[in-house]
Amino acid sequence: MEVFFLSLLLICVLSVSIRLYLLLYKHRSHFTGPNLPPGKIGWPMVGESLEFLSTGWKGHPEKFIFDRISKYSSEVFKTSLLGEPAAVFAGAAGNKFLFSNENKLVHAWWPSSVDKVFPSSTQTSSKEEAKKMRKLLPQFLKPEALQRYTGIMDHIAQRHFADSWDNRDEVIVFPLAKRFTFWLACRLFMSIEDPAHVAKFEKPFHVLASGLITIPIDLPGTPFHRAIKASNFIRKELRAIIKQRKIDLAESKASKTQDILSHMLLATDEDGCHMNEMSIADKILGLLIGGHDTASSAITFLVKYMAELPHIYEKVYKEQMEIANSKAPGELLNWDDVQKMRYSWNVACEVMRLAPPLQGAFREAITDFVFNGFSIPKGWKLYWSANSTHKSLECFPQPEKFDPTRFEGAGPAPYTFVPFGGGPRMCPGKEYARLEILIFMHNLVKRFKWDKLLPDEKIIVDPMPMPAKGLPVRLHPHKP
């Protein structure tokens, strides 16, 4: 009997050993080939993902990049991230190469967790779904279309400050910034303006956003499991809104051009077919994520830096009050007013340089190619990092110094300032983000000055930068 159990144990150990060997062999086989970039591949499945993520959790995501640039004396290096063989392209030359070769040598890539959270994309892929969205969005997000949204956005901003900021001594900025940008997205994408209706989505939506780019382990208690549950709840609510909008369009109670939702319901593909409800719900869900998450981070860091730099605040205040004093009582901001906010936008750009809401993004090599003398195999994932240029001494003198004058005149050199990406895949919502950020700034500074309550509050990047405690501030209302 003892011999039997000993034999069984040996078989189990041998089986596990063989599996581990095969896993290690498969992992290393992804990194074989002539003249690959220098770098370390780490352990199977894990690779260097924990180091990559932990530098963000500690508030310094650029450390992962700059440490390896220094170690390998190269602006391109190999690694393994999110279970995939990868190369990191750092610097303006790497940005230019990736942005200029979209759909030629590379195309967009998202972790598998994205396809699992958005089930309609599994019929094609999240890449194909993104292409469809980029065809739908331009007419709603181009400057001509955004002009008519300016007054609406100012109206919502005024309501937001009246509800959440006025008559308060202290506030926590980050959750309020998320509430504002989410309210805007709901209003402009789906014509939902009632705060109670917006609030119904708010909590599950933040659960979804925080668990979207995580290790895709669907077990109770994991961020990914919570994200799937939240997405199912939101999708159910969205489908109810879609069904009602169909009825309203049929009965002429809704306009064909009032928002993105109406356009999606009426749009057809090359074969004349309409999108199904699930596909529309997933697209709206994706838009809500892209339409508010990054802007709320940028707004929060604007508040942070203006609290720390009173001379910057005073210049922004002067510019915004000149605009405010030119308006009649009760008159909303218009497009021309926003175009006058030049210094304010330079400040916002400097904030996004130092704390880019979009830390970077992945591409996938669709063919073998050579960059900087190194071979990049087909199928490898390629990561570009905003911080690799934003905080580079070569691209920005005194990179740690807050200096909005960097954006005067011609501004930074091409491919060095990339908070919205670049090339064909530059964020289509760039102008929309500019509007919501500037309108928030206008309504904030004309009401308050403020102080940080936690002078040394830690910054976390996961995946966007955010203050660990949400940036609590003490408000000082301006005297009438």
Curated annotation (Swiss-Prot):
One BP term from GO: saponin biosynthetic process
Pfam families: p450 (PF00067)
Claim: Heme is one of the keywords in the record: yes
Disulfide linkage: none
Catalytic EC class: oxidoreductase
Cofactor(s) the record lists: heme
Similarity annotation: Belongs to the cytochrome P450 family.
Entry protein name: Beta-amyrin 28-monooxygenase
Source organism: Vitis vinifera (Grape)
Lineage: Eukaryota, Viridiplantae, Streptophyta, Embryophyta, Tracheophyta
Gene behind the chain: CYP716A17
